[in-house]
Amino acid sequence: MDSITMVETETLSKTLIKPSSPTPQSLSHYNLSYNDQNIYPEYIFAGFFYSNPDGHEISTIREQLQNSLSKTLVSYYPFAGKVVKNDYIHCNDDGIEFVDVRIHCRMNDILKPELRSYASELIRPNRSTVGSEDSTALVQLSHFDCGGVAVAFGISHKVADAATILSFIKDWAASTCDLSSSHDVSTPVLVSDSIFPRQDNIICGQFPASPNCVRKRFLFSPEAIERLKSKAIEFGIEKPTRVEVLTAFLCRCATVAGKSAAKNNNCGQSLPFAVIQAVNLRPLLELPKNSVGNLISIYFSTIKENDTVNIEQEFTKLVIGELRKAKDKLKNLSQEKLNYVARMQDFANCLKELDISSFFDMENVDIDAYLFSSWCRFPFYDIDFGLGKPIWVCMFQPHFKNCIILMDYPFGDDYGIEALITLEQEKMPAFENNELLLSFASN
């Protein structure tokens, strides 16, 4: 198989899955938070590939998934509604779109390393922007000639972040495995705008697509990550984390690629750069893991000393040091000696200084900004719909220049990291052929 375009797909059915019990009228209005209002209305997807070793019939799998999805939506009722005017969700039980697709190939054919980036697109509905009449959430069940199946769940980023997606899918999977018993879906914490109060007249446009970009994946084995951590320790960095060392390493490779692209295109000097890191606020705010919404913020640091890219030790210490300073500043906002409610409101006010939408303005600033989002340590590989554990978990979100997603990736009994990297087309060749990168990464 030379190209993913050779794969024939067949849509067998589309249906709307509604909550198994109607949502009370008193819960029909669910306010978006200030964070939600500043997020673009784009779908983000998580996809799970299962080999289905027990050979479950697809009709049985479909029925169980749909029934358990309906049951799960009773607790996650906003997901079955519609976002209105970037202000609130009308929880009208319209339902979640469920698409059943036959993919006419064997699963292993599209899970070859060179095709996995395309495989993640093949198993999801071909949709990115959430229109006013679109389902807030989507599901696609894909089944292959070999009997393998893939389950993709997508939801508007307007109402959910990665932690919310994980909570929902965990509950859905648990319900699927336990339909015959008295299992109750765990009750999610629907915080609405209680922490980050909604504001009137917040206008959020469409996602600033980056059409001249290309996305590729790179794998870092546990051994490669340990090598990076060992080097960081040699440089004098105390207790470096996996994400810290990989962030610094990828920034260096990307910056070198940027210098090379600027030189090849006669663009003069390359730009200084900023490192932007998305952060889950639940631990900082002492909120339950299954709190629903965009409970995230960002911390970032501008690296002015761009020449240090040529000196590995100085560059690594600079990036990790600056990120730790920015992270500490964010942590300190949540550690005030105030009562719980007052502390939440104070935190919300402080976060206005770190406006969650501000990093999108980097597109119009004379700086090379890299946005990192880590899904590491989220147990996506434990998701079991009664089909065993997934052989691969992927995520998909719209192309955004200099966006780098980090996820756990299984290497035997241990986990390395899979990096999904989006760069400008003219920068990617220099990046993926960088000898330093290739000494640590594989495809």
Swiss-Prot record:
Coiled-coil segments on the chain, per record: 316-343
A single Gene Ontology CC term: cytoplasm
Keywords, sorted A to Z: Acyltransferase, Alkaloid metabolism, Coiled coil, Cytoplasm, Nucleus, Transferase
GO biological process: indole alkaloid biosynthetic process; response to jasmonic acid
Entry EC no(s): 2.3.1.-
Gene3D superfamilies assigned: Chloramphenicol acetyltransferase-like domain
Annotated tissue distribution: Expressed in cortical cells of the root tip, especially in hairy roots, as well as in etiolated seedlings. Mostly expressed in roots, and, at lower levels, in leaves.
Location relative to the cell: Cytoplasm; Nucleus
UniProt induction comment: Induced by jasmonic acid (MeJA).
Catalytic residues identified in the record: H157 (proton acceptor), D384 (proton acceptor)
UniProt GO MF annotations: O-acetyltransferase activity
Chain positions of motif Nuclear localization signal: 215-222
Biochemical pathway: Alkaloid biosynthesis
Major enzyme class: transferase
Record's keyword annotation contains Cytoplasm: yes
Catalytic reaction annotation: (+)-minovincinine + acetyl-CoA = (+)-echitovenine + CoA
Assembly notes: Monomer.
Function description: Component of the monoterpenoid indole alkaloids (MIAs, e.g. echitovenine, tabersonine, lochnericine, 19-hydroxytabersonine and horhammericine) biosynthetic pathway; MIAs are used in cancer treatment and other medical applications. Acyltransferase catalyzing the conversion of (+)-minovincinine to (+)-echitovenine.
Entry similarity comment: Belongs to the plant acyltransferase family.
PANTHER family linked to this entry: BAHD ACYLTRANSFERASE, F21J9.9
Name used for this protein in its record: Minovincinine 19-hydroxy-O-acetyltransferase
The species this protein was found in: Catharanthus roseus
